[in-house]
Design a protein with these regions (language model features):
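Small-residue-rich segments within alpha-helical transmembrane domains of MFS-like 12-TM solute carriers
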Residues: 13, 17, 83, 99-107, ...
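Residue-level signature of mid-helix packing/kink "hotspots" within the transmembrane helices
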Residues: 17, 45-53, 137-138
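Extracytoplasmic
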Residues: 1-34
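Helix-loop-helix hairpin linking two adjacent transmembrane segments in secondary transporters
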Residues: 129-180
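Helical-face signature of the major facilitator-like transporter fold
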Residues: 5-13, 45, 79, 87-99
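Conserved MFS/SLC helix-loop-helix module at the cytosolic interface between two early adjacent transmembrane helices
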Residues: 50-89
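Cytoplasmic helix-loop-helix junction between adjacent transmembrane helices
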Residues: 94-132
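Flexible cytoplasmic inter-helical loops of multi-pass small-molecule transporters
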Residues: 176-195
C-alpha cells in the first residue's frame, strides 16, 4: 500500500526536476527571462515548504488514503494546468498546486510504512521509498529530454498529469490506512491502534 504513495513521491521528484530539462521550452513559450523562470520553478518549492506542518496534521486527522487520493487529484490538476495553460499566471498556479499536493507524499508514506511493515523493516522500506523518489528525478533527466524532443514538453507533462490522475483513482480504490482493513495484522504501535 505504501508503494502507491511512494509513487506519488516519485512523481513529486519528477515534477521538481522537470523544469531544468524544459527550461528553454518554458522560456520560449511563456516569453520568460531568467528571473521569471526561477519564479516559475520556485512556485513548487513555496507550496511544498508551506505544506510540511499541515501534512502531518492532515494525515493524522483524515488518514493516509484520503489525503493521498486528494493529493493525487490536486497534483494531476496542477500538472495539467501547467501543461496546457496558455498564460504564465496559469503556469504559476499549476506549479503551486503540484508543490502543495506532492508535499504530503513523504509523511504519508512513512505513516503507512509504520502501519503496514514491522518495525525491523522500517529502515528498509524508507530506503525503498527514497529509491522510488529518486527514480522520479532520473526520469526527469534523459528520458524526459528524449520525450520532449519527440513529442514536446506539453505532451510529456500532460501524460504525467494523466498518469497522476490514474494514480489518484487506484489509490482511492486500493489503499487502506491500516492492514486490519483488509484483515491483516497491523504493525502500528499500540498507542496508535488504540487511538
Amino acid at each position: 500500500m505504501w508503494g502507491l504513495v511512494a509513487t506519488l513521491y516519485c512523481i513529486g521528484f519528477f515534477q521538481r526536476m522537470a523544469p531544468a530539462v524544459i527550461a528553454d521550452d518554458l522560456m520560449r513559450d511563456f516569453s520568460l527571462d531568467g528571473v521569471m523562470l526561477g519564479n516559475l520553478s520556485a512556485m513548487y518549492f513555496y507550496a511544498y515548504a508551506a505544506m510540511q506542518i499541515p501534512t502531518g496534521l492532515l494525515v493524522d486527522q483524515i488518514g493516509a488514503r484520503r489525503l493521498a487520493s486528494i493529493a493525487c487529484l490536486i497534483a494531476a490538476a496542477g500538472i495539467l494546468i501547467f501543461s496546457f495553460g496558455s498564460s504564465l499566471w496559469l503556469a504559476y498556479v499549476g506549479r503551486f498546486l503540484v508543490g502543495a499536493s506532492v508535499a504530503v507524499a513523504w509523511v504519508t508514506c512513512m505513516k503507512l510504512a509504520g502501519h503496514w511493515f514491522p518495525a525491523n523493516r522500517f529502515a528498509t522500506v524508507t530506503g525503498m521509498a527514497l529509491l522510488l523518489g529518486n527514480l522520479g528525478g532520473i526520469m526527469a533527466g534523459v528520458p524526459l529530454a528524449v520525450g520532449v524532443d519527440l513529442f514536446g514538453w506539453r505532451m510529456m507533462m500532460g501524460v504525467s498529469g494523466f498518469l497522476t490522475l490514474v494514480l489518484a483513482i487506484v489509490t482511492w480504490l486500493a489503499l487502506r490506512d491500516d492492514p486490519s482493513e483488509y484483515g491483516y495484522r497491523s504493525h502500528a504501535p499500540l498507542v496508535v491502534q488504540n487511538h
